[in-house]
Amino acid sequence: MLYSPLYQSIRLILFGALGLSSLTVSAAINQTDSMMPEPLVTDSSNQYADDVATDAGFNNEINNQDISYQSDSQQSAAYKKASLSSDATLSNDAAVNNNNITAINDRTKTSQDSRVAPVNTSNAAKAGNRRIDTNDESIQESLKRLAEFYELTPDTNVATSNNTGTSVNDEQNNIQNSLTPVTTNIPTVGSNLRLLPHTVDSAARCEGQWVYPKKNPNYQRAVNEASASSGQPAPNLNGLPNNQAPLFAESDYGYYDNVDYAELSGNVIIDQGTQHIEAEKIVLDLSNGVAAAQGKVMFTDQATGNVSVNGAQDRTQQNGKTSLTDKATQGGLIGVADNLNYNTETGQSTATNVAFASVELQAHGYAKRLNRPNESQYELDEVMYSTCPPTNRKWQFDAKSIDLDTETGRGEAYNTTFRIADVPVFYLPYFNFPIDSRRGSGFLLPNASISSENGLEIDVPYYFNLAPNYDATLSTHIYTTRNPMLSGEFRYLTENYGEGIFNGSYLPNDKEYDGEDRRSLFYDHYWSSTSIPRLSGEAKYSYVSDADYLNDFDTLGLSDNTLNLPRRAQLNYYNDYVDGELKVETFQTLDALNNNGQMLQDKDKPYSRLPQLKLDYRLPWAKHFDITGVSDSAYFKKSIDDGSENEKSGTRFYNKLSASYPMENSWGYIKPKLSLQHLFTTYDEDSLVDNSLDKDDGSQSVFVPQASIDAGLHFYQAGSPFGAFDDTLGGYRLLSPRLKYTYSPYRDQNDIPNFNTRIASINYEQLFSDSWFLGHDRLQDLHAFTPGINYRYIDATGVTRFDGSIGEQFYLDDGRVTLDNTKPVFTSSSSGLVWDTSTQPYNNVWVDVSGALTNSYDLNYITTELRYQPSDRSLFNVGFIKRQRDENTNQLPLSALTASAVFPINNNWRVLAQGQYDYNRNQMLDSLIGIDYEDCCFGFAVYGRRYYNDLNIAEKPTQAIMAEVRLSGLGSGSSRLTRLLADKVLGFEPVQNAWKD
C-alpha cells in the first residue's frame, strides 16, 4: 500500500474493534458460565491463549503495491490534491500486530499540545446500583443498529411441512439418488401418522437468529485486479488466515498530507479476510498519537457472502462438546459503536455505546463505555448480556461496571443483577470471576430440590482453586427436615503418580434418622506408568455410615445402591502374550434383606481377596497350535462373627493349560482342543479350628482333563429372505450351523470351599462355553453336545435387519458336581431350548426377543424389547420380562413390564416418562414423569420420581419432585434428569442431542 500511515490506521481500527468486542463477550460469558470447576492440569504455567488485548508498535515499512495502475508519484499527487470518489486501496502486508483502537472526534489535524487521551477510570468509584435502562435513547439506537443483523425466521407450519413441500436439499438428494444405482431403504414406519409432530424445528423456537454481515463484493474484484497488475495469480480468500489475507479499503474520500496525517471518510468499508469494518470516518494522526474510527462504526470478524437456501447462514452444531468460553474466542462477533479511539503511544483505548452479538453463541449485549487503560486491563461500564432474541429479552444480566485483567485472568463485576422478564431475581454487589481457562476460587451455582425424605434442599458450593493440579469444592446442604450437612470434594493430578478424587460428607444429629450422625467417604485413584508401557493401577475406597445413606442423600437415585461397597487396590499389565491383574479387595456390606426376606448374615457376605493374582497368557512359539493358559491364585478371607456358619477362609490356586489346533476357512472351521485343569485349596488356621480339621484334611487337590471339538459352517447367499426385499433392501444372507462336543470327567469336590463361584445364567452364548460355573472353585463334569444355528440378513447398506440364533445343550451323562453340597447341576437330559433374536424391520423400529425353555419345554424365561423412534427427537420403548424359578442357576421369579417415552408436543414442549411395573406383586417398582420446555432463550423441566430402594424392596418407596431451569447458552447442558434417563432409557442420548440441537 502506498501510504503506510493510512494503512496502519485501517489495521489499528480493524483489529482494535474486534479485540474490544471479543473481551466484552468473554467477560459476559465467563461471569455467568465459569462457575464450574475446570479440568485439572499439571502445567502450572497456564496462560491465556486467546489474549486479544496485546498492544505493539505498528509497522512503519511501506508497501508499494495497490490496485491502481498509476505510478507511485502520480498516486501521491492525487491524494494530496483532492478527494477521490470510490477510492479503493489494497495491501498484502500481513506483518502488522493486532492493536486495539480508540476514536477521536477531531475532524482535522490538531497540535501536539491539544492532544486528548481517554481518561483512566480504573480507580473510579463502583458504588451505586442503578439499573441499565435499555429504553435509553442511546442504548436503543445502538441495539437497533445491531438488530439489523438479526434475521427473523419466517412462520412455518410443521404439519404442512411434513405433508407437502420439498426443500432444495431434498431435490438435490432426489437427483443424486436417481443418478446412483443403489438400493432404497424401507421407509420409516408411522410416517403418515399425525398424532404428534413428526418433525421438530429447533430453529423455530426463536423469532430469528443472528447472522453475519455480508462481505464487500468489491473485495475479491480488487484482489483480482491487484494480482493481475503484479503478474501474480489471485489468492483464494476462502480458508486463508486473516493475517495473511490482503487488506482492502473503500471510501468516498481519502486524504494524506504526506507527513503524519491520513484520513478516509464517507462510507468507509474495510475488509481483510473475513474481518470487516464500516464507519463514516477513519483518521490517523501521528503527531497526536491517535487513531480513530468515527460515526456508526460496525465491525465483524466473520463477514461472509455465503447464504443457505432458507436465507440464514449455516451454524455448526457443537452438541455441547465445546465450552462457551472457547466458542466466544472462536469468533463470530458483530459489533456496532459510536466511535473507537486508540492512543498509539500509551496503548490506551476507548469505545462508546458498543452493542455486540455473537453468532456462534446466538447472544448479544451492550456496554455504555469500554476503556483499556493499558495492555492488560479493561473497564466496561453499564454492561448488559443475554442469549434471548433482541425482540423479546426474557432474561438478562446487568452490571454497573466490570473490570478485567488479562495478566491475572480475573474479572470483577460490580452491582450485578439477574433479571427475568425485567424483574430482578438476584443481586450481587461484587463478584469475582475468571475470564480465561485459568481456574479461580469462588461460589458455584447453587442447586435446589424437593423430595419426600429431605423436604426442600438447597446446596451452596464453594470452589477452592488451590493449585493448577489440585483443587477442592466445599458444599453446604440445607434441609427443611434435617440438620445441615457439609460435603467436600478434593481432586488432584500428578505428573508421574496418576490422578484421584476424594468425596466426603458429614451430617450431625440427623433428625430424620433418630438423631444419628450420617457420614460418607469415597476415594478413587487412577495411574498409568510413564516408564513401563501398558502398566496401570487403580485404588478405590467406599464408606457410608448406614445402609440408608445412598438412598436418603441421592434424591433421584443416581448413585448405585450397591449392597457391597468395594475397597481395593489393583495393578494391571498386558502385552501381546500376557494379561495380568494383581489386586487386594475388601467390601463394606450394607444391611439388607436376602432373597427370603431375612436380614443378611455374615455367611452371606462376599470374601475379601488378600490378595488375588490372575494371569491369562499365550505361548508364542507354537506355529500351528494355539497354546493358552489361565492362572488364578488368591487368599480368600471372610470372618464369621455371628455364628451363622463355620468360617471357611483359605488359599486357592487354579491353573488351566489348553492346546487347540484351529482349522479355518471361509466356508467353515473345526477347532479341536485339549485342556488340563488343576485346583488346589487349603484352609487357614482359623478355618481349620472352626471345622475341626487337621492340616492335611484342610487341603484339597483336583485334576480334571477336558476335550472338546467345536465345528461350524458358513453358507452365503445373495438376496433377501424369500426374495421379499430384493427390489428395496437387497443385501445377502448368512446361515451358520454350529456343533460342539465337550467331555470332562467327574471328580469329587464336595470338601472344597466355595469362595466366589456361581452358576451362569442361561443364554445362547453360554451353551458353547466349557463350564457353567463362573469362578474357579468348581471344575464341572460335563459330557454334552450342543447344536446351534445362527441366521443373519444384512441389507445392501450394511444394516443387519435380522440376527437370530437358537440352540440346545444335550447331556450324555448326568452332572454330579455340586456347588454347595446341594443338587448337582443339570441332571436333566438337556438345558432346554435357548434363542436370541434381534430385528430391525424398519429404519426406526427395533425388536429384540430372547428366552429359554426348560428341558420339558416349559417356559424358563423370556425378555422382549420394542423400540420405536418416529423422529430424531422422539422415542418409545416397551419391554416385557418373565422369569420362572430355576434351581440350576438360582434364578428368582420375576414378571415385569417396562416402558419409556420421550416425545415432543411441539417445537418447545416435550414429555418424558419411564416406568417398571411388577405385575406379580401389583407394584410399580420405578416410575418417572416430567415435562420439558426449551426455546432459544431458556428452558425448564418439572418432573417427579417414585421408586423403591434396591437394597430393600419391602421398604416404603422414595418420592422426589424436582425442577430445574436452564439459561440457553449458559451451563453444560447436562442435568440430573438427563443423566438419569440416559441410564434408564435405551437410545435416550441421541434423542437428547437432537432435541438440544
UniProtKB/Swiss-Prot annotation:
Keywords: Cell outer membrane, Membrane, Signal. The keyword Signal applies. It holds the Pfam family LptD. GO terms for cellular component: cell outer membrane; transporter complex. Residues 1-27 form the signal peptide. Gene3D superfamilies: Lipopolysaccharide (LPS) transport protein A like domain. Its main location: membrane. InterPro entries: LipoPS_assembly_LptD (IPR020889), LptD (IPR050218), LptD_C (IPR007543). It is found in: Cell outer membrane. The keyword Transport does not apply. GO terms for biological process: Gram-negative-bacterium-type cell outer membrane assembly; lipopolysaccharide transport. Component of the lipopolysaccharide transport and assembly complex. Interacts with LptE and LptA. Together with LptE, is involved in the assembly of lipopolysaccharide (LPS) at the surface of the outer membrane. Belongs to the LptD family. This is LPS-assembly protein LptD. It comes from Psychrobacter cryohalolentis (strain ATCC BAA-1226 / DSM 17306 / VKM B-2378 / K5).
